[in-house]
Amino acid sequence: VFNVTIHLVDLLSSNTLVQMARKVEEGASVEVIDWDQKTKSPSMPITLRQNQKKRGDGPLTVLVTGSTGNLAKRVLPVLEANPLVGKIVCVAVRDKPNEASRSILRGDKIVQHAGDLSAPRLGLTTEQFQGLSNEVDVILHMGALRSFWDNYHILRLSNVESIKELVHLAAPNRIPIHFMSTSGVLPRDVLGSAAGQAPSSAAAYEPPLDGSNGYVASKWAGERILERAFESLGVPAYIYRLQPTRALSSDTSKSWVLDEFVRCVDLTAVMPDCTGWEGHIDLIPGREVAERLGEALISSTRRTDVGEAAKAQLTRYDSTVTVSVDDIETHLEELRGMRGFDPVPVLKWMGRIKAVGFSYVLASLEAMLTNGNGGEKLTMWR
């Protein structure tokens, strides 16, 4: 067994066993993960303990991560339109090449800070970090690396350490933190058999000790850190899991989402290459999620019963429609196959259509990547 971590895309791009062996040799050595140790609540920094400040009744300041993502394109306009919100502080903003990503940060209420989720203080200076700890009223954490195949060790800095930094910022004034997680933190049989009664905490379902299924493992760790920060520091925590629908998708809802794929194909002039992919995706209209999140953010700043709650608060958003890879491929081929659009790998295609305003957000997916002979290579649930 090789106790190393490697970007899977690097391994799959190796054409020979010699090249694969070289990638293994170059991989970073990793240890078995002690999940209890890795998800301990951060302590409150001494530099922030002395800066506690009572908040007034003026317009709210909302801190947002993941502000150039697909969901943020729906959330930021909702927050800007709310008269109770005076300022939206977008942190850990990394430069993106396309204009659509930058344009959503140009609202009158938006202040942006360049940075990186993987950096200490999210790339903010000590003074900026302390200032926001006193200014911010509520935090919405949507930022994460969403690599489909990478190990937890590769995603840890961006997806887990960033949450600890937000706890540091929130703790002095007990600023509510709203965290976008995934239903993948629960085993499929637990989620599927619960009929709406899935456990609110995923604490009992630790991820693999080797860090495999890294994205889901990082979300599980994030939930646990926030749960424990609530217990030890009193930081209000709100966790959101987008999950598969429990009802059959209507023909109308499937038609709407398939037509949305067609619209995005026309805008990008590329088609998805689904070779080797099987499975399905569960989707929710982005506007619906954004409006519900906006209401929850405002509501959490007014709550007086947070200290009486026994645990972090969980909210589930059920998807409204499920479509299979075959559904997507067949529909697009029938309506746009004759136009000669260039095919691109399906994951890259999803990124392209998000960039041009795909109006749904991914609630969950179950996918299998097979080789050319139909043999199973990789299975993913998130």
PLM regions with names:
Residues 1-50:
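Phosphopantetheine-dependent thiolation modules in NRPS/PKS and related acyl-activating systems
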Residues 55-84:
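N-terminal Rossmann NAD(P)H-binding glycine-rich loop of SDR-like oxidoreductase domains
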Residues 84-97:
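Conserved glycine-rich Rossmann-like NAD(P)H-binding loop of the short-chain dehydrogenase/reductase
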Residues 106, 110-161:
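NAD(P)H-binding glycine-rich loop region in Rossmannoid oxidoreductase-like domains
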Residues 138-141, 149-150, 157, 161-214, ...:
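Conserved Rossmann-fold NAD(P)-dependent oxidoreductase catalytic core, especially the SDR/UDP-sugar
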Residues 161-165, 221-222, 285:
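Conserved cofactor-binding/catalytic machinery of classical short-chain dehydrogenase/reductase
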Residues 191-197, 227-282, 286-297:
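NAD(P)-dependent short-chain dehydrogenase/reductase
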Residues 292, 296-371:
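Mid/C-terminal beta-alpha module of Rossmann-like enzyme folds, strongest
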